[in-house]
């Protein structure tokens, strides 16, 4: 497992370097104002967001703390299909992954799962030739997908709390999730247990339930 972990660390550093070469710092007066609010609430230094030169619509954060928004997402913002506050909710979500340690946790967890999967696949291949390795990889994918979905819900919760505390609220977070399938062109199927992300509907319901529980708690 340690060999896989070291390999993951090395791959992560290489990935961070590649992303930095394909990106530039993002500056926008609307977004910058929201970032200043986040900096104040979280007591952060200079919070920088990078534009990654990729066409797909996505946001991500690397273990070294860099937050990236793809050029495809920025293009939708410039076209008016995504508002500044909706784009800010993506940044809040990525901050959630970073603050909750998801990026570093995944290095360890996924490396461990990969190592265990290799052992299981080897054993199953002897018992069930040809299909044993396929079953092992499938089980590994189920575990990884389940953990990834859990992280997404947690990052959404963190983002919701940050957006509420900054005076923005969860409305832009929910409105973006509602249009996410249309923007990405990827429609969620009814079966989500093999997917890395929960469906937009599941995420919206979780945010609404969470906010309702906070309001009830205040009362």
What are these regions (language model features)?
Residues 1-198, 202, 211-218:
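A Zn2+-metalloprotease active-site environment signal
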């Amino acid at each position: 497992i340690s060999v896989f972990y070291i390999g993951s660390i090395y791959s992560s550093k290489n990935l961070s370097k590649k992303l930095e070469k394909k990106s530039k710092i993002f500056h926008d007066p609307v977004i910058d104002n929201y970032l200043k609010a986040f900096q104040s609430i979280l007591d952060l230094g200079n919070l920088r967001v990078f534009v990654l030169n990729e066409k797909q619509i996505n946001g991500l954060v690397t273990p070294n703390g860099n937050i990236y928004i793809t050029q495809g997402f920025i293009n939708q913002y410039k076209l008016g299909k995504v508002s500044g506050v909706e784009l800010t909710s993506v940044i809040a979500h990525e901050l959630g992954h970073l603050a909750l340690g998801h990026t570093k946790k995944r290095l360890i967890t996924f490396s461990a799962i990969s190592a265990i999967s290799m052992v299981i696949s080897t054993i199953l291949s002897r018992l069930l030739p040809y299909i044993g390795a396929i079953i092992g990889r499938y089980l590994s994918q189920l575990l990884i997908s389940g953990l990834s979905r859990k992280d997404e819900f947690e990052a959404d919760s963190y983002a919701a709390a940050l957006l509420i505390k900054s005076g923005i609220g969860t409305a832009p977070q929910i409105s973006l999730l509602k249009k996410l399938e249309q923007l990405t062109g990827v429609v969620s199927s009814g079966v989500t247990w093999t997917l890395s992300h929960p469906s937009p509907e599941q995420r919206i319901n979780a945010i609404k339930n969470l906010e309702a529980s906070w309001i009830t708690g205040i009362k």
